[in-house]
Amino acid sequence: MAGIIKKQILKHLSRFTKNLSPDKINLSTLKGEGELKNLELDEEVLQNMLDLPTWLAINKVFCNKASIRIPWTKLKTHPICLSLDKVIMEMSTCEEPRSPNGPSPIATASGQSEYGFAEKVVEGISVSVNSIVIRIGAKAFNASFELSQLRIYSVNAHWEHGDLRFTRIQDPQRGEVLTFKEINWQMIRIEADATQSSHLEIMCAPVRLITNQSKIRVTLKRRLKDCNVIATKLVLILDDLLWVLTDSQLKAMVQYAKSLSEAIEKSTEQRKSMAPEPTQSSTVVASAQQVKTTQTSNAPDVNDAIVKLFNDFDVKETSHHLVISHLDLHICDDIHAKEKESNRRITGGAMQLSFTQLTIDYYPYHKAGDSCNHWMYFSDATKTKNGWANELLHEFECNVEMLKQAVKDHNVGSPPKSPTHASPQHTQTEKDYPLKGTCRTPSVLSQQSKAKLMSSSVVVRLADFNIYQVSTAEQCRSSPKSMICCNKKSLYLPQEMSAVYIEFTEYYYPDGKDFPIPSPNLYSQLNALQFTVDERSILWLNQFLLDLKQSLNQFMAVYKLNDNSKSDEHVDVRVDGLMLKFVIPSEVKSECHQDQPRAISIQSSEMIATNTRHCPNCRHSDLEALFQDFKDCDFFSKTYTSFPKSCDNFNLLHPIFQRHAHEQDTKMHEIYKGNITPQLNKNTLKTSAATDVWAVYFSQFWIDYEGMKSGKGRPISFVDSFPLSIWICQPTRYAESQKEPQTCNQVSLNTSQSESSDLAGRLKRKKLLKEYYSTESEPLTNGGQKPSSSDTFFRFSPSSSEADIHLLVHVHKHVSMQINHYQYLLLLFLHESLILLSENLRKDVEAVTGSPASQTSICIGILLRSAELALLLHPVDQANTLKSPVSESVSPVVPDYLPTENGDFLSSKRKQISRDINRIRSVTVNHMSDNRSMSVDLSHIPLKDPLLFKSASDTNLQKGISFMDYLSDKHLGKISEDESSGLVYKSGSGEIGSETSDKKDSFYTDSSSILNYREDSNILSFDSDGNQNILSSTLTSKGNETIESIFKAEDLLPEAASLSENLDISKEETPPVRTLKSQSSLSGKPKERCPPNLAPLCVSYKNMKRSSSQMSLDTISLDSMILEEQLLESDGSDSHMFLEKGNKKNSTTNYRGTAESVNAGANLQNYGETSPDAISTNSEGAQENHDDLMSVVVFKITGVNGEIDIRGEDTEICLQVNQVTPDQLGNISLRHYLCNRPVGSDQKAVIHSKSSPEISLRFESGPGAVIHSLLAEKNGFLQCHIENFSTEFLTSSLMNIQHFLEDETVATVMPMKIQVSNTKINLKDDSPRSSTVSLEPAPVTVHIDHLVVERSDDGSFHIRDSHMLNTGNDLKENVKSDSVLLTSGKYDLKKQRSVTQATQTSPGVPWPSQSANFPEFSFDFTREQLMEENESLKQELAKAKMALAEAHLEKDALLHHIKKMTVE
């Protein structure tokens, strides 16, 4: 009996083993136990059974002892146990892929029989191995894998041990069965070391990695008919891993992986070409269904349950997965590598990388375009990627259809080519390319169109991660800070959302057909990532990666490895970002001001970066509109070479942008133009990565300050949110790609210059493309006719006007910025830090590589319609409180369009306005003291659309202006301020909307006419004497709800033209309307931010004085959200007045001691009697407003055009500003300003902006700036032109701005040259006056025709006029030496009179007449001698100036140090 069984065992095991004889088998038949010793397994059979990749081969497998235990009576429920003691396997890598694997021996043994009892028993075998040692020999290294306590067993669908009958799910209707296996081990030890060779001197440290308990879960789907495996799902699960790698070990790992990459890539291509057809199982399912129909019809309920269970655990396609719950990776420097420490800036550094829930999925056989809902970790990111990829596939299919038609037309219209006339690469057999006759084309195309396009996808997910800053031994021991991390928890994002999601997809045909295939695509999603700039970490990482790259290059050179990376192949890329944050911190000081920020953060709500045109706001039409906006500005024209630009600037608007916007850079465009012969091969529709045009779009982009003590842990706004678009192209790389040898199927890449018709024809109408071009291009003859020599538009040759990278930056909406002194100091410090960091990075690159860093040129264009910069300054000292508030407030600025000789008219006008304001004030005070006071808050009044206004010639006033707008500063001038109220009137400095520099929107309105124009007004009216009339519209109350008093603009504003006589408003000038909203309605960011020193929500406390006829009302508290809702619900013609709680003064007097401060809308405070509770509340609010009081100066900027040219170390910044209008708000509560400031730009100002710029700036730095000054290379050289500029300033604002710009340290000297021409500035002295002085100083108007201010390297300022500037002889130096000097230490400003005396010349006298003043000069010398002498003198003068500048700097530093010591 034993002999018979031995023969059967030999019969089956002989297929797996070598030299197996009966004497090696010990068998106990009754016990069901057997033992085999010294088994040598067959390598090829194991390769087929394990289905190893073809780049790996098994050389030898040996097992010292194997035992088997068979439970004869329980074969259905219990597995056969196979135990192996020690298995040794020797393997090697193949440089060329070996022959593909054959059929599995298990399937062969079953004789293609159906899935029966024997197959179930064999499949349920349980295997245990004490030790497995796998040795792999490769070209560059040797590796070994040692596994201990390996177990292989069958489990149920929930991965639990149990009865064998539950380890499989069989569906007779499908004719398929699912089986579940699990493999686990206690430990795996991995070692790798370089190959020892005498002629190779590559020294690599050995790599040793150890993992703890891990497991693999396998799900197999077989066919019942023949037991063949249809699909497999394999999941490798690794628990917590902690690996420490030195830089030498990491280098070794990268080198080993690189040595295998070429073989793995070849093997992958072989696998794709022999991939199984995905529809094989469908036919089997149908046949199996017919066979099993009679068996399954009897038990429909049971079958439904089986089908449901099978569907729940079905494996629809083969996939492999890696799951790591937590991975800690520590990378550190080699402590023994002393020879490298001299070159390293940071030595002994270590960095920790922590990854949580890392998963990698691989789907090798996914049909292109099919659903991915069955994927293991299907999520919203996968759904978004699928939608984007399907759009790409649809576009590709349309191109293929057009290509087929082009091939057909080409073969019909041209005779067949003979092989002798074609290039060798084009000589193809009829099988490979059968398009030689017109009769065969349709059948071939129909056959190829039925080919099934497959895709291979790799998905990487990362739930959370932390990359910590580098730590060194010199640092104090503390927990490391994050450099890159995920903020999902702080932003309350779903836990199932991945921090990083990356999916890469490639396409192929299973049979390896030479047919067009789509470009691979890469989709990435970044959620709530925060990047923190850490100087030490960036420098250490830069050195680490440079050293790694250098060692890899040496390794590849030694082993003669080819760099087969497909960097030049186009890949469709899309990167989505959600709530990304970029933080730039500053050095933390132990003691700092409460308004001193610790960091600046750059954030965006949503971001898209892509090189495809299938994403929102990144399409061809978006680029076309943006390009047209840039093209409409003369500043960006190639022919614009006037200041601030020059003829050396790059051509920003490169033709690549224009061609891409009109879809003229595609392969199909070239095919229909006749420049490429149409062929149906794999690379016909593929393009180079050099032709990519990238688009980056931020839906909301903003900048905050962080770490301010006054902010109470919340970020403080710096730049309010705005949408941002960036478009990028690479002209230099594109031109280089065109120089490379073209494939022979391309006739030429030249394109006709007749753009007019091409620009109009859009490739979106792809079906009409052929008809369109058939009338434009010449007929093709044999596909070899080249276009004319004039068709050179498409080929770009690199020139000095092209940079490596061109960027178009477009800001779509109005930009608002606010900054105080300490925030300004932070920006200066961060600017210096970033410059130092870039310099250190450049030096490290040169030190590691031994060669200069690559000089990259970048051209950046910036287009901004309007902006607003608010300077938050210290409060201005107020005037004497005993004076009349109106006498100090009324200082109307003389309109520029009025002649200066009209003194009487202006004087009478001032008196009239003063009387008007006094009348309004007295009426308001009396009205408040009459127990009917109220507060009018115009910050929430919805105004009409300014575009709907009638011209001033019809009505003189727009109907949409509310009543209180006429009380604003635009009509009444500057009203004096009240410290107790925390409100301010705006100064009449004009608006952005002024059409020319000579006109301001300052209107002098007869207030009595405004208030008195309709005596029958049922809302509010005053008589001509200023007495109060009846307030007929009583204030109604609804419990504790909002109290509203509605002014109707139609009733308050006249339509009769007779009012125009009292208003003196120009027909062309209409005051712009400001729409004021609460801050909550402005913030488009999904985060909580607050203005400086404010609570998170802007709360307005509203109250009203009650009359006897009114009900008792409680104090009403309204937050900004309620205000916003009511504003949205109200009619646009109504003006809501929310009654605001007044600030109670301690004094009992009725007059106002100091002026009120009201922001852009009159808030009239009540000073009547209040309850004790209200008094305490008011006193707290008054204290809060007083602490929050700041002087605000707003610069409204219109039309900003900028260009930044970077050539290696040289940087040129050209900036042009059409119009700048300062708006001096005076002392104002910061809360009111930030909550009530306008959100958008003034459309009228944008439309009527100046054609000629008021301010032009040019800044140069780097070695190229030495032509201006020796110091300019380091500190830069600034040139500024101010032309046709007209404005007004208060002396208090100028002094405040000076304090704002003061630095804590001695500022570096920046050479500069400033030209001011045709400029007028009105100066108003608003400094505090003594009580004895009743008259205030008259405004001073300064006219500057032409003035030049220069600053040299020694810090001195030189002031001269245009005549001195235009001289070109050597006398210029003498006059320059005699000109007025403004030393940086003293800032001694001389008067204009002393300038004329110091120069001792008259500007009107020509230079030749001045030769008498210089008798020592003789003009007999030749011009060449004089120029040579002049140059030598200039050099000596420059040296002297440098020495003087150093002396000045040293002196200033000492004075600063002495001053600091004195203060301390």
Swiss-Prot record:
Protein name stated in the entry: Bridge-like lipid transfer protein family member 3B
One Pfam family linked to the record: BLTP3A_B
Example GO biological process: intermembrane lipid transfer
GO CC, one annotated term: cytosol
Predominant location: cytoplasm
Oligomeric and partner information: Monomer. Homodimer (via N-terminus). Associates with the Golgi-associated retrograde protein (GARP) complex. Interacts with GARP complex component VPS52. Interacts (via C-terminal coiled-coil domain) with STX6.
Gene Ontology molecular-function annotations: GARP complex binding; lipid transfer activity; protein homodimerization activity
The keyword Coiled coil is annotated on this UniProt entry: yes
Top-rank taxon: Eukaryota
General function of this protein: Tube-forming lipid transport protein which mediates the transfer of lipids between membranes at organelle contact sites. Required for retrograde traffic of vesicle clusters in the early endocytic pathway to the Golgi complex.
Annotated localization: Cytoplasm, Cytosol; Early endosome
Coiled-coil positions: 1418-1456
Modified residues (Phosphoserine): S414, S418, S774, S935, S1009
Domain Chorein N-terminal: start-end pairs: 3-94
Keywords: Coiled coil, Cytoplasm, Endosome, Phosphoprotein
Record keyword Phosphoprotein present: yes
Residue ranges of the region described as Disordered: 267-297, 409-436, 1066-1089, 1164-1183, 1392-1413
Skewed-composition ranges (Polar residues): 278-297, 1164-1182, 1394-1413
